[in-house]
Amino acid sequence: MKKKLLAGAITLLSVATLAACSKGSEGADLISMKGDIITEHQFYEQVKNNPSAQQVLLNMTIQKVFEKQYGSELDDKEVDDTIAEEKKQYGENYQRVLSQAGMTLETRKAQIRTSKLVELAVKKVAEAELTDEAYKKAFDEYTPDVTAQIIRLNNEDKAKEVLEKAKAEGADFAQLAKDNSTDEKTKENGGEITFDSASTEVPEQVKKAAFALDVDGVSDVITATGTQAYSSQYYIVKLTKKTEKSSNIDDYKEKLKTVILTQKQNDSTFVQSIIGKELQAANIKVKDQAFQNIFTQYIGGGDSSSSSSTSNE
């Protein structure tokens, strides 16, 4: 999924809402037994220092702040479309995946909506910063479309063996891709794929190697990070077509805009700064000492601390 599911989110959201009845009252009884009870307040006092519970309270705050500021600009269809994509990806296992993450369909929708609201806020700020300097920097770093044939393998020794065949005179690279590549999306087409420097379908190491090749050139074995943790995949690339880069920046203006905005969305420091500004503007007051530090990753010290101060009012 594009956004990670929060494990235990349903339970923790329920826990976080107990804060409302934690002050001045034991709240309702949650558990009764022979000779004793467990109240909402007792439960709240036990869990409020749990890092997971604190993270959920932070998420709830962000959700409310961004919903108030940007909620009217987000169409529910965007959320529904994302849910539809996830259902297509996971098929009949979708409900099980949600359940394992401690979520229902409704809580997942709420999570997606919050993510999209943050994305909307980031996009607005990023668009306001689309300066000539930003465009020039993106243009200097941009490489237009190339077409290549790619063979992906999971074993380095196998990759070296295939490379030897690929560099042999008269080698049929397309057939080698069909016979050996583990990339199901491209192998049947002889490994052919078109991409530019902004594409995400191809690892950065592979793009860099491909851009350095002449047409009909074949790379050495390229090692890239695999999809599994601490794993590697091995690529062999043959460049078949190279687009000459225009010297006129206006020819790429729309593409460069997309590149810049995507970079901003992927810049965790930039995203955190936007969230921090919105939280400060909302004049957040923390009512329980246990939660006084949950906003520090977004709101630093100095003047900003007054916007997330602890209050006993």
Curated annotation (Swiss-Prot):
Single GO molecular function: peptidyl-prolyl cis-trans isomerase activity
Coiled-coil ranges (or none): none
Top-level division of the source organism's lineage: Bacteria
Catalytic activity: [protein]-peptidylproline (omega=180) = [protein]-peptidylproline (omega=0)
Disulfide partners: none
EC class name: isomerase
Purpose: Plays a major role in protein secretion by helping the post-translocational extracellular folding of several secreted proteins.
Name assigned to this protein: Foldase protein PrsA
